[in-house]
Amino acid sequence: SGGFDFSFLPQPPQEKAHDGGRYYLGPGPMGLMGPRGPPGASGAPGPQGFGPAGEPGEPGQTGPAGARGPAGPPGKAGEDGHPGKPGRPGERGVVGPQGARGFPGTPGLPGFKGIRGHNGLDGLKGQPGAPGVKGEPGAPGENGTPGQTGARGLPGERGRVGAPGPAGRGSDGSVGPVGPAGPIGSAGPPGFPGAPGPKGELGPVGNTGPSGPAGPRGEQGLPGVSGPVGPPGNPGANGLTGAKGAAGLPGVAGAPGLPGPRGIPGPVGASGATGARGLVGEPGPAGSKGESGGKGEPGSAGPQGPPGSSGEEGKRGPSGESGSTGPTGPPGLRGGPGSRGLPGADGRAGVIGPAGARGASGPAGVRGPSGDTGRPGEPGLMGARGLPGSPGNVGPAGKEGPAGLPGIDGRPGPIGPAGARGEAGNIGFPGPKGPAGDPGKAGEKGHAGLAGNRGAGAQGPPGLQGVQGGKGEQGPAGPPGFQGLPGPAGTTGEVGKPGERGIPGEFGLPGPAGPRGERGPSGESGAVGPSGAIGSRGPSGPPGPDGNKGEPGVVGAPGTAGPAGSGGLPGERGAAGIPGGKGEKGETGLRGEVGTTGRDGARGAPGAVGAPGPAGATGDRGEAGAAGPAGPAGPRGSPGERGEVGPAGPNGFAGPAGAAGQPGAKGERGTKGPKGENGIVGPTGPVGSAGPAGPNGPAGPAGSRGDGGPPGVTGFPGAAGRTGPPGPSGITGPPGPPGAAGKEGLRGPRGDQGPVGRGETGAGGPPGFTGEKGPSGEPGTAGPPGTAGPQGLLGAPGILGLPGSRGERGLPGVAGAVGEPGPLGIGPPGARGPSGGVPGVNGAPGEAGRDGNPGSDGPPGRDGLPGHKGERGYAGNPGPVGAAGAPGPQGVGPVGKHGNRGEPGPVGSAGPVGALGPRGPSGPQGIRGDKGEAGDKGPRGLPGLKGHNGLQGLPGLAGQHGDQGPGPVGPAGPRGPAGPSGPPGKDGRTGHPGAVGPAGIRGSQGSQGPSGPAGPPGPPGPPGASGGGYDFGYEGDFYRA
């Protein structure tokens, strides 16, 4: 029936099983388990287990995709999807330029007014058509494309460290050196648990053998299927500590899910209590010796040391005696750390075994001959995790892996060079209304405008100047106007003189950092290379060039728009520039041509000045007339009072660029403001890196040879070094090949069938491997149509495809005979002609057009908005502390005499200057200087240029249609019979399909289906161990205890 056989587990005790008048109350001692029998027939599913829930197993490897199954029967209509989000409003198109006014067409000849024809007779009602043939059922639909892989789940909790295994039975020998890691072995199949063997007697104390090198690390085995949890069994005998099991194959990583919206970070939790340190387990059996790694390349020489002080030349002393060998010189410069290798994968946490009793140490025996090689023991429980190995060399770069989850935003880096200018983007929507700006200065008086056309009425006498009205209230802001028509290009004005450079403002605060770029796909793990010897550390080389920019990752699905970020702090306002002097008023432009005035009417007598009436309602705006020539400039009005600053209107669309104005006269330079205070000194920058070593200096004079010193005293052995922190967990290596299948066990005897238990539905196990393709089932009968669901909201419209080509036009029908026109009479209209014949019968309708060729795909949709960055993952748990290293052997070498004093080294060159520190913050804004006095009046400016002609006026309204001219109208001819229907037109081609719309919202989860039929009975379990009880009688019945 597939999967593993769990019939060897002990069955749960029955409440009260009756067997021939006897009752069994309790289990006896557990006997030895016999050899495993062959698997029996599948028995009925057993009752619900009573054990605690086991730890979740590792995810199994995703099986290969099965063959495509046959098309199933048509499914039921799914529930209506959730309403889609409303689409974004389309961008507003740019208003096109005004079209040129067309020429008036030639007026047509007035046609004759025809006589109204008679109404046609009503057609006969057709008989109802025969019912259509019932269509055959449609073919079953194909399976849809598989959905996207869900987001990768969070990593599971780290397994607990297993308890130490039972104590070994060997004598206490010293631990030998750990050999290098061997090659990775192939993964074996998951073995069945063996029966616990009898407890062996304590053997004689053997001699301590040499510690072998560490064995090869096993490959990762296939993850086993989690079986049902059985009842707790009796504690068995203490087993031997087994070798470390192979790690399982890593599960296939799912495709990255869509990044969710960024959540609000919660408060930082309190630090948890430090857990108790686990006991170090017994070391496992030694493996075969691995191959030695290659020797690393020696590092380059370190930088030259500082020169020593120049010693005085001493007197030559007597030649001393030949001294004994000197002590070992100081160690050389420590080499740089070798390239970091990929650390091995963590093995799965073992089951916590019972702590074995410590055996008593036997007396130290006489060293005997080397014993025979023992057989490998049964694999036992997993030992404690070993110390981390030495870092290996960096493996070759792997292939690109799937895109990882986006990291958190990093700190803003240094400002890079300016990139190339990007392409112009689409016109964005108007931004939010900004704060009201400072009130602007009063502008200079503009040039006189062009005079409008003179009114049609007679020109009246000028009225008396009215009383100046009061200040009006501020009106509400009007709606934003549409973009105006582009005006004609003006003539280019003269280039003005460059203005004087203003005082640079203070540096503003740096703006917020830009969004972080998308992370490229991660590379696959490279193979672990052999660990090389650590070379001596060379000098730091110059920084290498920047690497190539990674290619952008795959564009993810459009994420939902996140909330608007808070705006950055506004930069400090720069110091005000020196105000320029007011330029001279230019001369009045040339007076335009005076329009032709109409004839003056009779001048009326001036009336009395009436009281100002109420303001009338604003009338409809008439159409703009053609612009007339420029009139004379009117007198300058009195300056009005300055109104209050109104609210800022919405941003309008940018109009066309106007013609360049004339440059104003150069103003005089104002007085210089007081000097601002110095800003706060910025923090000191980081110390620069050490410079390259300088050239060797000249050799100093030779020093005298000193006397031989007394022999040194042997030092004490050094203390054991502290264990360094464990390295971070490495990337899991590639899965190894699957191992060979194990031998089939013996078949067990058939057990009695237990009662059928009705347990609750357990948690779903890991997905099994895809089964073979089943036979194609017959299509089921279609179910009744479901009730229509509520109307869903319209989805976002897809991009329209290209329009299909138009079908060919059908041949025109034959025109009916036209009646002859009557003679053109001269007298009164003739009598009305007789009505035409009965209209002809309509022809049969043509056949439906054939489907056209499929259109090409529409253009691709635009990229969606980038999703929010994911939050940073939680920090991993710290690794276990490694065991302390053994103390080194004590030195025995003889004590040497003092060596000769070395000559002073050459003087090193000075290192490069360190990098500049960051710019200090801007100092406080200086006090504003006094306002400069007005400059002298400048020379008179040049006369202004003649204004441009006004824009062409809009075309006037069309005139009314003229009356028909005189002339007699002839009688209408008789109506001809209806012509026959034309042949049916050809089939039009099918239009192009639109582009695929966005994926709909995931439908609601379906309800649970009915329970399936009961499975076949499982294989019977082995007979239970003998209880070992005794029988006793009570009230005529026998009981067993």
Curated annotation (Swiss-Prot):
Disulphide bridges, residue numbers: none
Composition bias, Low complexity: 25-45, 55-76, 174-189, 235-256, 300-310, 354-370, 405-424, 522-539, 551-561, 594-638, 645-665, 683-693, 714-723, 769-803, 811-821, 874-887, 903-918
Chain spans, region Disordered: 1-1041
Modified positions (4-hydroxyproline) in chain numbering: 10, 13, 39, 45, 376, 379
Tissue specificity statement from the Swiss-Prot or TrEMBL entry: Expressed in bones.
Main location: secreted
Biased composition annotated in UniProt, kind: Basic and acidic residues: 77-91, 666-675, 928-939
Pro residues: bias regions: 1013-1023
Pfam families associated with the record: Collagen
Compartments reported by the entry: Secreted; Secreted, Extracellular space; Secreted, Extracellular space, Extracellular matrix
Keyword terms: Extinct organism protein, Extracellular matrix, Glycoprotein, Hydroxylation, Secreted
Residues bearing PTM 5-hydroxylysine: 113
Post-translational modification summary for this protein: Prolines at the third position of the tripeptide repeating unit (G-X-Y) are hydroxylated in some or all of the chains.
Biased composition (Gly residues): 290-299, 332-341, 466-475, 562-571, 703-712, 754-768, 822-840
Oligomeric form and interacting partners: Trimers of one alpha 2(I) and two alpha 1(I) chains. Interacts (via C-terminus) with TMEM131 (via PapD-L domain); the interaction is direct and is involved in assembly and TRAPPIII ER-to-Golgi transport complex-dependent secretion of collagen.
Its biological purpose: Type I collagen is a member of group I collagen (fibrillar forming collagen).
Protein family per UniProt: Belongs to the fibrillar collagen family.
UniProt xrefs under PANTHER family: COLLAGEN ALPHA-1(XXIII) CHAIN-LIKE ISOFORM X2 (PTHR37456:SF6), SI:CH211-266K2.1 (PTHR37456)
Protein name in the entry: Collagen alpha-2(I) chain
Source species: Paramylodon harlani (Harlan's ground sloth)
